[in-house]
Curated annotation (Swiss-Prot):
The protein's name: Protein-export membrane protein SecD
Gene expressing this chain: secD
Keywords of this entry: Cell membrane, Membrane, Protein transport, Translocation, Transmembrane, Transmembrane helix, Transport
Recorded topology in the membrane: Multi-pass membrane protein
Pfam entry (one): SecDF_P1_head
Main location: membrane
GO BP terms: intracellular protein transmembrane transport; protein targeting
Record bears the keyword Protein transport: yes
Sequence similarity: Belongs to the SecD/SecF family. SecD subfamily.
Organism, as annotated: Methanothermobacter thermautotrophicus (strain ATCC 29096 / DSM 1053 / JCM 10044 / NBRC 100330 / Delta H)
Subunit-level organization: Part of the protein translocation apparatus. Forms a complex with SecF.
TM regions (residue ranges): 14-34, 238-258, 265-285, 294-314, 336-356, 365-385
């Protein structure tokens, strides 16, 4: 027996599995598993651009939105493109009404003297923190040298005329040109001022303007077409439900295997192989920072169920044959022919679902992208890593006579 154990542990497939399981445990413990919004709570905002855009423009849009939300003070933000006309914003632990105004505005700044645009957002080089005094607020910012020069030329000789400052075509303030500025002397330090009904409203308005000025304008107009949220309490309930579902699935599998084989040497290896498969899936998810949500959990359960099916196929093929070594090898080859055919069919069925899911984003059928991805990942891990190890165990320890 000791010689068989030594031979089994020296097999390259077994060594590979042990190394990958150890790496997965390390990845899970150090990197953690990212939970989807339906498990940890948070908000999901779907934004639609006014027209389809190319990859470079889409990168600009997602970059500006990500910058805005970080400046606004929102943590755990994920902004990603969904096709060529939609953007998905995922925010953990934040209600959507707190950030919807920020992500849904173009952020276009203009300053006009008369009907002439004298400043735009591109002329701003830095924005200072807002100053709140009672219900009044001001947001100081600094102009570039070229912007200050353009403004000075436009303001020359126009003392007392208003400088109308617009944000997304909405008039924010209209300070008068001072006598000093009207001389044509460039001024780099400018400020936007205003007043609200309360100090709290003043703080919100000033923070929003600071955020929009700092992040810059979006290259295209956008609109919010979908908003959803899950409270942390509800997310906790979902997570608990998923754990219960997983435990019930394990219990059901255990009952079926015990009833079918009535032998620990047949049942325990299937459980250890299944556990290894689960660790590899979660480890891969931790490394690539893949969100584990309810759909992904369903995919994991489907992959594990498929894995148990495959191990039953291998076991039954060996048990139905004669005890000779050559016969066992042929039986295992027959089993793997069935397993590969089944895996190919399943992957072929999942790929269109994954494609549609990724192209649609995290709404509607897009939620099933997580299901398809984790199912395919689990099947690939099983077929190329865990199934061969289980087959090697069956072959090495000659389970044909142990039923």
């Amino acid at each position: 027996m000791n010689r068989k154990v030594s031979k089994f542990l020296k097999d390259y497939r077994v060594i590979l599995l042990i190394v990958l399981v150890a790496a997965s445990i390390t990845a899970i413990s150090t990197m953690g598993i990212q939970q989807g919004l339906d498990l940890q709570g948070g908000s999901l905002i779907q934004i639609q651009l006014e027209r389809p855009v190319d990859a470079a423009t889409m990168n600009t849009v997602t970059s500006v939105l990500d910058k805005r939300l970080n400046i606004f003070g929102v943590k755990d933000v994920k902004v990603r493109a969904s096709g060529d006309q939609n953007v998905i914003v995922e925010i953990a632990g934040v209600q959507p009404d707190q950030v919807a105004d920020i992500v849904g505005k173009p952020g276009k700044f203009e300053a006009k003297i008369g009907n002439e645009t004298v400043l735009t957002g591109t002329d701003i080089v830095s924005v200072q923190p807002p100053i709140i005094t009672g219900n009044e607020w001001e947001v100081p910012f600094r102009l570039s040298t070229d912007g200050a020069r353009k403004f000075a030329e436009a303001a020359r000789g126009k003392a007392g005329e208003p400088v109308k400052m617009y944000l997304d075509d909405r008039l924010i303030t209209a300070p008068e040109i001072s006598a000093e500025v009207a001389t044509g002397k460039p001024v780099t330090d400018v400020r936007i001022t205003g007043a609200e009904n309360s100090k709290a409203e003043a703080e919100v308005q000033a923070k929003e303007i600071e955020t929009l000025l700092k992040s810059g304008s979006l290259p295209v107009k956008v609109k919010i077409v979908g908003v959803s949220s899950v409270s942390p309490e509800l997310g906790k309930q979902f997570a608990e439900g998923a754990v219960i579902a997983g435990l019930l699935a394990v219990l059901a599998i255990a009952v079926i295997l015990i009833v079918r084989y009535r032998s620990p040497i047949l049942v325990l290896p299937i459980f250890f192989t299944t556990l290894a498969e689960l660790l590899l899936i979660l480890g891969a998810a931790a490394v690539i920072r893949w969100n584990i949500d309810l759909a992904a959990i369903a995919g994991i359960l489907a992959a594990i169920g498929t894995g148990v099916d495959d191990q039953i196929i291998i076991t039954d093929e060996v048990l139905s044959g004669e005890g000779r070594r050559t016969r066992r090898k042929f039986r295992i080859k027959d089993a793997f022919f069935i397993i590969f055919a089944s895996a190919g069919t399943l992957i072929a069925a999942m790929l269109p679902l994954a494609y549609i899911g990724f192209s649609r984003g995290a709404t509607g059928i897009g939620l099933l992208a997580g299901f398809a991805f984790t199912t395919v990942l689990g099947v690939i891990i099983g077929v190329f890593i865990t199934r061969p190890v289980y087959a090697r165990f069956i072959e090495t320890f000659n389970v044909a006579g142990r039923k």
